[in-house]
Each structure stands twice: as C-alpha cells, then as structure tokens.
C-alpha cells in the first residue's frame, strides 16, 4: 500500500487554515495517521516512495498527478463521497448552481464525487449550460495573460451566464471570481462545515500577489 499525504493546498491555508487542520484531524481519525503536505504543487515534493496525495485544490490534483515522480492523487471529494464517517449538514433542498474548475475539467471522477456530496447535503443543484467536461473558465486562468481589467470582464461575463446567484465552487480562485462577478459563492469546504464563504482578498491583483508570496515560500 502506498504512503498517503494530505495536501490542503496553498489557497485553503490562506483562506481558512483552521478548516485544513480540522480536515486533517478527521482524515487521521478515520483513515489512519498521515502527514500534511505543505509543499506547493508548483514545487517538486521529491517523494522517495509511491505516495497517494489526498488533495482539495484542482491545481494540486493536476500537478501532483502529472508532474512529479512517485505521486498519484485522489480528491478529498472522492473520499468523502464514499465515506460513512462524515457528518453532512442538511441544506434543506436549497438551490445552487456550480462552476467546475479548469485544472480538473477532464476528470469526471471529481465532477461525479462533488455532485454526490451535494446530494448528501440535500442541495438542489441547477446545472449551468456549460458544466462538467464542457465547463468554461471563471476568468482567473487568464490572469497574467491579459490585462487585469479584461480578467475581471471575463469573471463578470462568466457570472452572468450562471442561472442562480448561489454558486458552488471547489476552487478558491473561482470563489474570488464570483465575488468579482457579483454572485455569492459557496466554497465546498465551507458547505461541508456549514460555514459562510467570505470574500477576504478577491481583487485579482491583490489575490494573486498574496498567493504568489505564499507559494514562493512553500
């Protein structure tokens, strides 16, 4: 059996580190002890043996799966979707729509697991026109390629395409994009713990500066 690590991702550590710690504790209690991987997915973790990385961030899933030796991935969503140990909150059929993240656009296993989690939480999911493997970018992936104002225009355009104000996101950068676009994002980790998704830093320049500073050190 391969070694296991839990990778909360840089964005969650910046957003709500206490939830990363809480999740780590839940996984340790129910799956056995594992360390928390704090190496950013943009850097080689230099794993010495075959290691399964339990990840949250879509970018982490893509890079740890594809770019480094001795590394394979499974999303936290897949684990929780099949679990019998997590106490899911009940949202009483509240209707929400969703954005599927760019880095895992081709990973139907993740799309299916997330929708199973939403069902377990009694969320009535209204799929947008472009969803799953056919989803389109929230706008954040264009940062650094086009001007910040054009990035924000993309975010506003994406938000306007969604059928509801309440939007499930599982990428923190997607949540920032939805705040720019005037929607109310519901980050999946927040939903699992019945917490409100708050904006904190969401202007693209501010968010990417904060993220880059953290990533450079990890």
Describe these PLM feature segments.
Residues 1-218:
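Iron-sulfur cluster-binding electron-transfer modules in prokaryotic oxidoreductases
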């Amino acid at each position: 059996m391969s070694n296991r690590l839990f990778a909360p991702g840089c964005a969650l550590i910046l957003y709500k580190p206490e939830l990363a710690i809480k999740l780590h504790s839940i996984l340790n209690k129910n799956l056995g002890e594992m360390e928390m991987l704090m190496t950013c997915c943009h850097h080689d973790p230099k794993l010495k043996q075959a290691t399964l990385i339990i990840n949250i961030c879509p970018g982490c899933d893509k890079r740890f799966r594809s770019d480094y030796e001795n590394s394979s991935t499974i999303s936290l969503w897949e684990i929780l979707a099949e679990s019998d140990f997590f106490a899911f909150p009940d949202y009483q059929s509240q209707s929400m729509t969703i954005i599927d993240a760019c880095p895992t656009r081709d990973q139907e296993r993740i799309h299916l697991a997330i929708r199973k989690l939403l069902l377990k939480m009694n969320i009535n999911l209204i799929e947008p026109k472009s969803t799953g493997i056919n989803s389109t970018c929230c706008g954040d992936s264009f940062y650094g390629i086009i001007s910040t104002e054009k990035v924000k225009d993309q975010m506003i355009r994406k938000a306007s395409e969604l059928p509801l104000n309440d939007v499930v996101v599982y990428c923190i950068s997607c949540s920032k994009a939805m705040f720019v676009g005037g929607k109310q994002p519901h980050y999946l980790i927040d939903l699992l713990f019945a917490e409100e998704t708050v904006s904190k830093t969401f202007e693209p320049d501010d968010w990417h500066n904060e993220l880059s500073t953290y990533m450079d050190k990890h």
